Amino acid sequence: MTLWTARAAHRAWLDAEARRLVDFAAAADHPEHGFAWLDGSGAPLPEQGVHTWITCRVTHVAALAHLEGIPGASALADHGLRALAGPLRDPEHDGWFTALDSRGTVADSRKEAYQHAFVLLAAASATVAGRPGARELLDAAAAVIEQRFWEEETGRCRESWDAAWHADEPYRGANSNMHLVEAFLAAFDATGDRVWAERALRIAHFFVHEVAAPRDWRLPEHFTPDWQVVADYNTDDRAHPFRPYGVTVGHVLEWARLLVHVEAALPDPPSWLLADAEAMFAAAVARGWSVDGTEGFVYTLDYDDTPVVRSRMHWVVAEAISAAAVLGQRTGDERYEHWYRTWWDHAATYFVDTVQGSWHHELDPTLAPPPGGTWSGKPDVYHAYQATRLPLLPLAPSLAGALATVG
């Protein structure tokens, strides 16, 4: 079977889609404070203010685009770096606020591991891209993470603190730690410091090999401060965008991909990384893809595999595409090519918005954009953009590291 990625037309399609996503994200440029939340047509939503995670993701994508030689991307990356070094950073207690309002006033002063993971990711990618101030930002973010979030005794990270770092939240989460794996791998590529790869391995070992594997690859997302599973967390807010109840199908796929990146970072990787990656992928497909009579991935499952939230999120199919591309490259197994083609067809048919730009972020169970839902507008291009880049890159700990080897 000839891989789609070996065909010039497919590679050109991926490149064109990547450029389209970068162009859409460029409209989020807030003059002073970072990157705004965009509505469905790509216009900033002032009422949403500026979120640190969105600013970081656009900065990361812009740094990758600059590494690829896309004119104008460097200015976007530099704008994001200035915002992260300036208004989004706490000048009194250090660390990064969660959000500002449209005037630049702090709207959410919490210090979250999720936000800090993306600060580190953006800074690391921009460091590889050679952007001014990026390495200083990376070092600052790394210091805060090491001092406030990293638990050396457990090998994973706390969730969040108040603004002054006095009280940490009595909750631990898989989502933030998963993104810290990604950020730590990017920091390893940017600095060469192996401690980041070793920490990524420790986090992955706990969540995948210790928690998911004994549960037949069903990954609980929510934990007590001493890392006991809280199975009924958010039963009253099951579609929460960051902490939904039950098993999040897209995260199972994302972990499958990240395990391969962890493997690429280690000189002598343990064999369980690839074995667990393939098992996580297979479980997500069997339990999450078209299981309710309609094409697509459901958002969440109960622990008996019953669909809970049947909405289709754009980031889930994007992560599925990325996982299929990475595992296909790693193993050479044609099953992954089948799924890679299937999910790009699905994404192009239902999610890619060729009229207003970017991707629909959410579809209802009939595959139509809902009037309301978990997500409003189109704030994020990060998952979709990475799905267009990973299929064309060699395996590496991070996207920036991979681009640096082919640039």
UniProtKB/Swiss-Prot annotation:
Keyword terms: Isomerase
InterPro entries in the record: 6-hairpin_glycosidase_sf, 6hp_glycosidase-like_sf, AGE/CE
Alphabetical list of Pfam families matching this protein: GlcNAc_2-epim
SUPFAM superfamilies reported in the protein's UniProt record: Six-hairpin glycosidases
Enzyme Commission number(s) of this protein: 5.3.1.7
Domain of life: Bacteria
GO MF, one example: isomerase activity
Reaction(s) catalysed by this chain's protein: D-mannose = D-fructose; D-lyxose = D-xylulose
pH-linked activity: Optimum pH is around 8.0. Stable between pH 4 and 11.
Regulation affecting activity: Significantly inhibited by divalent metal ions such as Cu(2+), Cd(2+) or Ca(2+).
Active-site positions on this chain: 251, 383
GO BP term (any one): carbohydrate metabolic process
Thermal profile of function: Optimum temperature is 60 degrees Celsius.
UniProt similarity note: Belongs to the N-acylglucosamine 2-epimerase family.
Role, per record: Catalyzes the reversible isomerization of D-mannose to D-fructose. Shows weaker activity on D-lyxose, but cannot use N-acetyl D-glucosamine.
Subunit and partners: Homodimer.
Protein name: D-mannose isomerase
Organism: Thermobifida fusca
Gene: manI
